[in-house]
């Protein structure tokens, strides 16, 4: 993995733990996250202050920036009114800047919170689909490390406006749902659950959608953003029924699993996102050595998370281009 701004490469964490801690370190160094928040999030990911101190040192923090191993673990704060698995409030999405944004209650769409079984429990998801009963294609949507947010619900509605039944899972359903958790504890809860559990939940979601009369059986795609992009890549190696995937700047799958990919895979990368785009040629080479239908595209002049129009890195031109490219990919293969 390439270095960014002189930061050492982390080598002693799991893939998704490493991915998130490095992302938060970059936000902290750029002034977009306080040291207090950075420390809390790393502690929730690693499970102890000693491990948090070690991880923060590995990513490049100085000794006076890391907590003492004997410091108490942060206490999760009571959840605020952050929306999660509940039905979204009608109207515009808070902070949305994209002209593609679709408000809750938009004409011609049906939205609801649905539940389906996975691993002996019920998983919640936000479903958005066109009105009517004519069967059409569907797409599974995997959220970022923030959990199921109004932005991701908006993305689901954008797909619904394009004719898809879009199901955005709350991968923290077993923990009570995104809305029930301290926002700093959400990334740690996601990594502690493990990518395999998340992929299994998407398999259950696939089966749920495939059984609905408004879905044209078998015509199901998947997309994900940041952390969700990594889950989408892993799902592509395991969920053989998927027709296509579009992973937005997520960590790559294990290269030895690339030959098992069945769907047509599209990768969205940001030119300035060294951490994810830097290793991308290795993934491209692995894909080139197979019969997997694929395209990995780098969007110029933008950084990680450029598609999220509620964030500071949003770029309207490139986000719109990546969205249109994803739709074109799905039209071709789904």
Where are these regions (language model features)?
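Primarily recognizes the serine-hydrolase "nucleophile elbow" in alpha/beta-hydrolase
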Residues: 203-262
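Conserved loop-alpha-helix segment in the C-terminal half of the alpha/beta-hydrolase fold
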Residues: 280-291
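C-terminal catalytic histidine-bearing segment of alpha/beta-hydrolase fold enzymes
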Residues: 293-334
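Short beta-strand/loop motif that positions the catalytic acidic residue
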Residues: 267-269
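Short, proline-enriched alpha-helix->beta-strand connector loops that line the catalytic pocket
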Residues: 260-265, 290-293
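N-terminal secretory signal peptides
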Residues: 1-37, 46, 56, 60
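Acidic catalytic loop of the alpha/beta-hydrolase fold
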Residues: 272-277
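Serine-hydrolase catalytic machinery in alpha/beta-hydrolase-like enzymes
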Residues: 4, 27, 34-37, 41, ...
């Amino acid at each position: 993995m390439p270095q960014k701004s002189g930061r050492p490469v982390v080598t002693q964490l799991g893939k998704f733990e490493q991915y998130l801690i490095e992302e938060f370190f970059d936000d902290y160094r750029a002034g977009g996250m306080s040291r207090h928040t950075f420390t809390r999030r790393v502690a929730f990911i690693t499970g102890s202050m000693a491990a948090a101190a070690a991880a923060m040192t590995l990513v490049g923090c100085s000794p006076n920036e890391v907590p003492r191993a004997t410091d108490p673990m942060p206490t999760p704060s009571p959840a605020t009114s952050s929306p999660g698995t509940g039905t979204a409030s009608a109207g515009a999405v808070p902070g949305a800047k994209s002209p593609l944004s679709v408000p809750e209650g938009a004409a011609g769409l049906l939205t609801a919170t649905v539940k389906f079984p996975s691993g002996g429990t019920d998983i919640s998801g936000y479903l958005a689909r066109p009105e009517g009963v004519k069967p059409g294609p569907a797409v599974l949507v995997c959220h970022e490390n923030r959990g199921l947010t109004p932005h991701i619900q908006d993305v689901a509605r954008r797909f619904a406006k394009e004719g898809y039944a879009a199901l955005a899972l709350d991968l923290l359903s077993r923990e009570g749902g995104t809305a029930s958790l301290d926002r700093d504890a959400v990334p740690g809860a996601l990594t502690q659950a493990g990518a395999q559990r998340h992929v299994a939940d998407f398999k259950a979601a696939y089966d749920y959608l495939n059984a609905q009369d408004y879905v044209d059986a078998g015509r199901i795609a998947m997309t994900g953003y940041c952390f969700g992009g990594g889950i989408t890549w892993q799902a592509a190696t395991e969920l053989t029924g998927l027709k296509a995937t579009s992973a937005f700047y997520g960590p790559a799958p294990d290269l030895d699993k690339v030959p098992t990919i069945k769907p047509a895979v599209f990768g969205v990368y940001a030119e300035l996102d060294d951490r994810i785009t830097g290793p991308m040629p290795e993934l491209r080479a692995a894909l080139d050595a197979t019969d997997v239908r694929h395209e990995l595209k780098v969007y110029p002049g933008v950084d990680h998370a450029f598609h999220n129009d509620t964030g500071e890195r949003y770029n309207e031109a490139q986000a719109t281009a990546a969205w249109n490219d994803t739709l074109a990919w799905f039209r071709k293969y789904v």
